């Protein structure tokens, strides 16, 4: 049996805690880092900087180094809030340059089977933000999964009575794809959500 040092075993254990990192990937990453001590030092420094300097915005719950974050302090459309599941979803929305309003991160999606209930998400904080009356539209940009759909439906039921328009990202066929390779549910939603030209 191969003997691995205690510190390397500990590193492998920590790497395997990352998403999609199993035994082989952890071993490959660890040996890559060991071969280049300067990369290992830079990574360790970056990890410490993130630990000490990055936090969640107290307004939108996105990731920031200053509180409130840049997206909450710069001029944007205050009448609309886009609700996303995770902080990285803001990056995807911003890359598109299609949304000009504010954001709100739930930090997950409802999943009773996995024990994720409304109280574990940032839903109460969203409702507090909607109380002042300046928000006219909430765009639900949760993922198109069972959990994301359940979360969108739950939020719609909470927000509609506040006389705020609730919208959902459109479902559709990806640009550049062949119709014959698209699954039936996606085609059905694309047909149901079709628009007039």
From Swiss-Prot:
<dbReference type="InterPro" id="IPR006171">
    <property type="entry name" value="TOPRIM_dom"/>
</dbReference>
<keyword id="KW-0479">Metal-binding</keyword>
<feature type="zinc finger region" description="C4-type">
    <location>
        <begin position="57"/>
        <end position="72"/>
    </location>
</feature>
<keyword id="KW-0863">Zinc-finger</keyword>
<dbReference type="InterPro" id="IPR000093">
    <property type="entry name" value="DNA_Rcmb_RecR"/>
</dbReference>
<dbReference type="InterPro" id="IPR023627">
    <property type="entry name" value="Rcmb_RecR"/>
</dbReference>
<dbReference type="GO" id="GO:0003677">
    <property type="term" value="F:DNA binding"/>
</dbReference>
<keyword id="KW-0234">DNA repair</keyword>
<dbReference type="GO" id="GO:0006310">
    <property type="term" value="P:DNA recombination"/>
</dbReference>
<comment type="function">
    <text>May play a role in DNA repair. It seems to be involved in an RecBC-independent recombinational process of DNA repair. It may act with RecF and RecO.</text>
</comment>
<dbReference type="Pfam" id="PF21176">
    <property type="entry name" value="RecR_HhH"/>
</dbReference>
<keyword id="KW-0227">DNA damage</keyword>
<dbReference type="GO" id="GO:0006281">
    <property type="term" value="P:DNA repair"/>
</dbReference>
<dbReference type="Pfam" id="PF02132">
    <property type="entry name" value="RecR_ZnF"/>
</dbReference>
<protein>
    <recommendedName>
        <fullName>Recombination protein RecR</fullName>
    </recommendedName>
</protein>
<comment type="similarity">
    <text>Belongs to the RecR family.</text>
</comment>
<dbReference type="InterPro" id="IPR034137">
    <property type="entry name" value="TOPRIM_RecR"/>
</dbReference>
<dbReference type="Pfam" id="PF13662">
    <property type="entry name" value="Toprim_4"/>
</dbReference>
<keyword id="KW-0233">DNA recombination</keyword>
<dbReference type="InterPro" id="IPR015967">
    <property type="entry name" value="Rcmb_RecR_Znf"/>
</dbReference>
<feature type="domain" description="Toprim">
    <location>
        <begin position="79"/>
        <end position="174"/>
    </location>
</feature>
<keyword id="KW-0862">Zinc</keyword>
<dbReference type="Pfam" id="PF21175">
    <property type="entry name" value="RecR_C"/>
</dbReference>
<dbReference type="GO" id="GO:0008270">
    <property type="term" value="F:zinc ion binding"/>
</dbReference>
């Amino acid at each position: 049996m191969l003997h691995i040092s205690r510190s390397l075993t500990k590193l492998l254990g920590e790497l395997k805690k990352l998403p999609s990192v199993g035994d082989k990937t952890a071993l490959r990453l660890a040996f890559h880092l060991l071969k280049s001590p300067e990369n290992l030092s830079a990574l360790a420094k970056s990890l410490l900087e993130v630990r000490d300097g990055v936090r969640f915005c107290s307004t939108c719950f996105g990731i920031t180094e200053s509180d409130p974050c840049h997206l909450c302090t710069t001029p944007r459309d205050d009448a609309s809030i886009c609700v996303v599941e995770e902080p990285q979803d803001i990056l995807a929305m911003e890359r598109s340059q299609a949304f000009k309003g504010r954001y709100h991160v739930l930090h997950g999606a409802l999943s009773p089977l996995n024990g994720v209930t409304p109280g574990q998400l940032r839903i109460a904080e969203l409702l507090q933000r909607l109380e002042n009356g300046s928000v006219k539209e909430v765009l639900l940009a949760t993922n198109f999964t069972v959990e994301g759909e359940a979360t969108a439906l739950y939020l719609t039921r909470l927000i509609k009575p506040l006389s705020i328009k609730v919208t959902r990202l459109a479902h559709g066929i990806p640009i550049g794809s062949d119709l014959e390779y698209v699954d039936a549910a996606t085609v059905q939603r694309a047909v149901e959500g079709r628009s007039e030209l």
